[in-house]
Amino acid sequence: MVQSINIENPELILATSGESFHWARRFLGAKMGHDAARLYSFCRVLDDMADGDIQDGPEHLVEIQAKLIQGQWGNHPLLDQFSDMVDEYGLSTNVVSSLVEGLLDDQADEVLIKDEANLIQYAYKVAGTVGLLMCDVLNTDEPRAKPHAIDLGIGMQLTNIARDVLEDAKMGRRYLPGTWVDNMTPQQILEASKNPYSHEALLITEAVHRLLSLAEDYYASGRRGLAYLPVRAHFSIGVAAKVYRQIGIQLLKSKDSWYGQRQVTSKASKVFCTLRATMSLFRRFPHPRKPHNTTLHTSLAPYKNQGGIWG
């Protein structure tokens, strides 16, 4: 939780709010790592605005969105702080606008994701966009990296949703597609958590497993794009992906799944994931690379090629 628009120490924000990314950041080097931390802190402040952790946060989001829609990057304290990164890396206002759009979607009195297409669109807006922005910060000018970066962000967001079903329900949000859970309301999810063997609770458990299976498709695509990144970025993002994916693996193994204790990764798990990530470096050796699976983006037509051609 940031609680302030002024970002004086992005490294501290990353350390306290993004354990998986903070662990992976150490492999990026000084300049790239610091800029990645700045991008994370920027996105984190936007997220905390959406959650009301920053005073007048939703009002700030509306103001920022109005600036971005007009193609402006400035005239707001948060935007002003990151204008140098926009200039250096050519960050897309359209991509950031889609990120803010997703966070504004969360301002509804009750958030109810309709179906899988709606879910993927939401995940693109709040996480796939971050993948696109990170591509620029990690100094890759290879357009084929972009669709894979989007998919890695989506995979991580699906894991996040699976982990936070109960926490989101307490805030009046249901990100599990209504078509998967008989259009249960957040209140019904809360009630189901009290009786894990009820029909409703078992339906939610099945939906969480289905969500994590869907996430695997996006993680697989994300991994295929790592070889387009500079070598240190390849390794660092590979580590972050494996650490985040580990949360889903633990959820599947957990006896109390979505209604139990919130899943986190231990230091031992992070070390294990780091060792496994070294294997991904072999993908850098020349070999025929599979084209991107475009069916993963069937729902993303309204956002196609934001921030440049997607491969």
What is each residue range found by the language model?
Residues 1-155, 162, 167-311:
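Catalytic cores of Mg2+-dependent Asp-rich isoprenoid enzymes
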